[in-house]
């Protein structure tokens, strides 16, 4: 499909959403004269912010909200689905053609792509890569699963500067001929098992980041490669990385040891030590800078000065010398475990707020932090039921609350000066919040109103 052909087509957007992706997609199509229907199971009230953002085009849009109409799917030339909609959705069987905002973007994009996926650490890594690459490529752009649709900056692309895309497994699922110049898999944990039939399907979707790549390099965590990805054929050079101790595998590999970065056992540079949760994104950024011949001294400075990004082990404020951290992006147990370990103190002064919606995961990894967390503060939810079973099995006391407000107030009440209150849910957010970002913002508002 050519850009000029958009104006002759009927598009149906399935899932406007609240995070900006549906709005950017709609604007991209409407500016090019598309005939557009937007359908979403959410109501007009729930979608008010997104609808208001499209107010300039209201005469060109027909909305079907609170339901889907089969006839809209039958009549559309192209259905553009939200990545979170499962491919076996009953309405999609009536579609003539199915795309996503990412697949549409890739049809028209001419910029080289650095693509990042993984269960956790994606957003931190792409944020670091953006800062590092900006030193050499002023026209670099950042988009994808980080909350910025690449369609929103399509008209600003120069056709030559690198484009950094963060991609979830859901976004990769529909990409059959994806061909970045650098593809990166940060790590793989059991996740989204409420979406996938099994873990193998999750791995297959993750592998789509590199299986059709024809130039450049693939960067994969050594353990993930050994366990899951070595069975997939790669047409390009595979380079592994290790956080600490390289796995014994016959591949090129880079790793970090006390802030020093080694490639095939040769020192290539260093950066200041940091929290465990940031080590993997930092060492990957350092190696990508090395590969692209970016000034490593400058990259080292960027990494050393990096304080993190919103919602990912984000320091909110100190209230009466009690330190509050927002880690709402930790939606799986392993991520919460890493965050707790990153904040570990000598006298274990972490009060952990955890719990939420189940994603068909287990919480056995919580045994690794049982001796680090001083107080377990739980918010009701389907995942919380599983957490309670783990804690009770180990005879660990916990405190259960119906709301985030009550949990925060209790955490503050029991904390002494020097304590840490960490909000790291290890679960999805859908029972009490619009999404994980809404959850994080509510936590920060509650903290800012303390004291």
Swiss-Prot record:
The gene is murD. Pathway: Cell wall biogenesis; peptidoglycan biosynthesis. NCBIfam families: murD. It catalyses: UDP-N-acetyl-alpha-D-muramoyl-L-alanine + D-glutamate + ATP = UDP-N-acetyl-alpha-D-muramoyl-L-alanyl-D-glutamate + ADP + phosphate + H(+). Pfam families: Mur_ligase_C, Mur_ligase_M, MurD-like_N. It is an enzyme of class 6 (ligase). Gene3D superfamilies: Mur ligase, C-terminal domain (3.90.190.20), Mur-like, catalytic domain (3.40.1190.10), NAD(P)-binding Rossmann-like Domain (3.40.50.720). One of its GO terms (biological process) is regulation of cell shape. Keywords: ATP-binding, Cell cycle, Cell division, Cell shape, Cell wall biogenesis/degradation, Cytoplasm, Ligase, Nucleotide-binding, Peptidoglycan synthesis. One of its GO terms (molecular function) is ATP binding. Cell wall formation. Catalyzes the addition of glutamate to the nucleotide precursor UDP-N-acetylmuramoyl-L-alanine (UMA). InterPro entries: Mur-like_cat_sf, Mur_ligase_C, Mur_ligase_C_dom_sf, Mur_ligase_cen, MurD. This is UDP-N-acetylmuramoylalanine--D-glutamate ligase. It comes from the Bacteria. Belongs to the MurCDEF family. Its EC number is 6.3.2.9. It is found in: Cytoplasm. GO terms for cellular component: cytoplasm. ATP binds at residues 118-124.
């Amino acid at each position: 499909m050519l850009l000029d052909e958009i104006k002759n087509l009927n598009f149906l957007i399935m899932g406007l959403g609240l995070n900006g992706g549906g709005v950017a997609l709609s604007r991209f199509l409407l500016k090019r004269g598309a005939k557009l229907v937007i359908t979403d199971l959410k109501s007009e009230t729930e979608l008010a912010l997104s609808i208001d953002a499209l107010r300039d085009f209201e005469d060109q849009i027909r909305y079907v909200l609170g339901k889907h109409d089969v006839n809209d799917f039958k009549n559309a030339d192209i259905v553009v689905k939200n990545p979170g909609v499962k491919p076996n959705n009953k309405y999609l069987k009536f579609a003539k053609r199915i795309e996503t905002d990412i697949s549409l973007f890739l049809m028209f994009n001419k910029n080289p792509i650095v693509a990042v996926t993984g269960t956790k650490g994606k957003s931190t890594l792409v944020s670091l890569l953006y800062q590092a690459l900006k030193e050499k490529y002023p026209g670099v752009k950042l988009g994808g699963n980080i909350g910025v649709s690449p369609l929103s900056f399509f008209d600003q692309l120069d056709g030559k500067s690198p484009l950094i895309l963060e991609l979830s497994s859901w976004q990769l699922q529909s990409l059959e001929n994806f061909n970045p110049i650098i593809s990166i898999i940060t790590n793989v944990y059991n996740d989204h098992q409420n979406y996938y039939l099994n873990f193998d399907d999750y791995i297959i979707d993750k592998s789509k980041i590199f299986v059709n790549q024809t130039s450049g390099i693939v960067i994969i965590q050594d353990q993930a490669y050994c366990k899951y990805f070595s069975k997939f054929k790669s047409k390009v050079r595979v380079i592994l990385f290790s956080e600490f101790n390289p796995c014994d595998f016959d591949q090129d590999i880079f790793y970090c040891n006390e802030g020093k970065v080694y490639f095939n056992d040769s020192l290539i540079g260093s950066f200041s030590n940091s929290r465990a949760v940031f080590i993997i994104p930092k060492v990957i950024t350092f190696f990508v800078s090395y590969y692209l011949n970016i000034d490593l001294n400058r990259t080292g400075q960027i990494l050393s000065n990096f304080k993190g990004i919103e919602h990912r082990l984000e320091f909110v404020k100190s209230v009466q010398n009690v330190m509050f951290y927002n880690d709402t992006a930790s939606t799986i147990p392993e991520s919460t475990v890493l965050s707790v370990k990153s904040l570990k103190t000598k006298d274990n002064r972490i009060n952990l707020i955890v719990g939420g919606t189940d994603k068909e995961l287990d919480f056995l990894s919580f045994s690794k932090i049982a001796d680090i967390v001083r107080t377990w503060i739980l918010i009701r939810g389907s995942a919380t039921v599983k957490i309670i079973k783990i804690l009770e099995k180990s005879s660990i006391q916990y405190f259960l609350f119906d709301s985030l407000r009550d949990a925060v107030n209790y955490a503050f009440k029991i904390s002494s000066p020097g304590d840490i209150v960490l909000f790291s849910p290890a679960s999805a957010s859908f029972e009490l919040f619009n999404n994980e970002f809404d959850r994080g913002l509510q936590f920060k508002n509650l903290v800012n109103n303390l004291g």
